[in-house]
């Protein structure tokens, strides 16, 4: 997530930081009650993939997983809404009827915490990645500009390289964004594929997504794709760790592509057992989850109940502030936000908050008790 705050009310985003945001976007949009009767700012602590211990679980060669709390500033919570789900394609490779026995857990080789320079891309590293993509585009880099960390100028957060027809942004987390300077004619993915075949694979799974404001007004739309794996397990990995997002301009042309390269900069620790959907739901209802949602404020009963579950998928929680990339069951939980929203929303409109239950069994953690359902 990288602590990135994305306000639904924003009209745009600084292109300098598009690449840095690639790893955050597929976690879902951050809902902000722009016209709420009261706005509460919360500093969110999410228990996410942490260090792993070089201790093996009994009768297993898999290292135990250890978690640490990660702080990131934010206002609002992570989630989605019924309009977005209704007007967007569901391309998740998993559903409740599919049983998965094992999924890999990865060590993030680009892990970074505040002030740490080691393991973070250098300016030369970022330029090398930009050069790779400029060659794929058949162009040469004319110039580039670097952007350093706000608190440590020795850390290069982003490099933006210019070619004749493209702008290539490479973030310190390895995320890549390519802006098409001349998008005329790029009205759909078939046109993009004809012009940029290296961006596509034979087994791609494609979906179109539409986002909405808190007032129910349409915002931007985009395409997302990932390569279908030979197994469901590989497809689940690709769905989060190896995907692309194509964004439309105001004129309806496809203006840019964000390329998730996190799997390229990770190390597989092993294939870990995965609990079933029913087990995950049981843990959710028992309070064994993490979330940026304050249940007391947004759930009438103050706790998650089965009747509030609207959707579930399996994703990898990522970002260069994650030491591990590991799978989670992500539950979409209905939240009662009407007391906080003064605008007239459709009667059947619903807001959802994300609640995460680790897909790896608790015996593979040394501190599973951190998943206690408290407001993170």
Residue ranges and their predicted role:
Residues 183, 191-329, 333-339:
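Segments that shape or occlude catalytic/ligand-binding pockets
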Residues 27-36:
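N-terminal export and membrane-targeting signals
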Residues 1-28:
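Disordered, charged N-terminal biogenesis/targeting segments of membrane/secreted proteins
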Residues 10, 35-61:
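Single-pass transmembrane signal-anchor helices and their membrane-water interface zones
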Residues 55-237, 241, 260-265, 375:
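Preferential activation on post-signal-peptide N-terminal prodomains/segments
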Residues 167-183, 234-260, 337-376:
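A short, surface-exposed beta-strand/turn
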Residues 17, 137, 288-291:
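Short, flexible helical or helix-coil boundary motifs
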Residues 14, 276, 356-359:
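Helix N-cap / beta->alpha transition motif
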């Amino acid at each position: 997530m990288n602590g990135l705050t994305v306000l639904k009310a924003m009209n745009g985003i600084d292109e300098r930081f598009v690449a840095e945001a690639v790893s955050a976007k597929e976690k879902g949009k951050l809902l902000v009650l722009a016209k709420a009767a009261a706005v509460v700012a919360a500093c969110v602590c999410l228990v996410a993939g942490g260090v792993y211990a070089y201790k093996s679980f009994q009768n297993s060669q898999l290292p135990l997983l250890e978690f640490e709390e990660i702080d990131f500033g934010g206002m609002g919570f992570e989630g989605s809404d019924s309009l977005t789900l209704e007007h967007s394609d569901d391309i998740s490779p998993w559903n409740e009827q599919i049983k998965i026995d094992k999924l890999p857990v990865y060590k993030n080789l680009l892990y970074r915490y505040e002030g740490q320079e080691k393991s973070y891309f250098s300016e030369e590293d970022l330029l090398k990645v930009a050069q790779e993509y400029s060659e794929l585009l058949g162009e040469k880099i004319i110039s580039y500009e670097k952007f350093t960390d706000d608190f440590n100028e020795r850390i290069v957060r982003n490099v933006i390289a210019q070619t004749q027809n493209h702008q290539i942004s490479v973030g310190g987390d390895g995320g890549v964004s390519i802006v098409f300077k001349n998008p005329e004619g790029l009205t759909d993915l078939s046109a993009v594929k004809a012009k940029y075949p290296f961006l596509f694979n034979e087994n791609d799974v494609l979906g179109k997504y539409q986002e909405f404001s808190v007032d129910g007004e349409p915002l931007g739309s985009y395409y997302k794709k990932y390569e279908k794996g030979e197994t469901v397990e590989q497809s689940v990995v690709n769905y989060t760790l190896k995907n692309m997002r194509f964004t439309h301009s105001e004129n309806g042309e496809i203006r840019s592509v964000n390329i998730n390269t996190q799997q390229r900069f990770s190390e597989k620790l092993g294939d870990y057992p995965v609990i079933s959907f029913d087990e995950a739901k049981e843990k959710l209802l028992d309070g064994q989850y993490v979330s940026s949602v304050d249940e007391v404020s947004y759930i009438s009963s103050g706790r998650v109940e089965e009747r509030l579950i609207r959707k579930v998928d399996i994703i990898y929680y990522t970002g260069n502030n994650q030491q591990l990339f590991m799978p989670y069951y992500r539950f979409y939980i209905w939240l009662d936000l009407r007391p906080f929203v003064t605008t007239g929303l459709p009667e059947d409109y619903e807001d959802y908050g994300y609640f995460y239950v680790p897909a790896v069994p608790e015996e593979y953690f040394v501190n599973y008790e951190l998943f206690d359902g408290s407001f993170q």
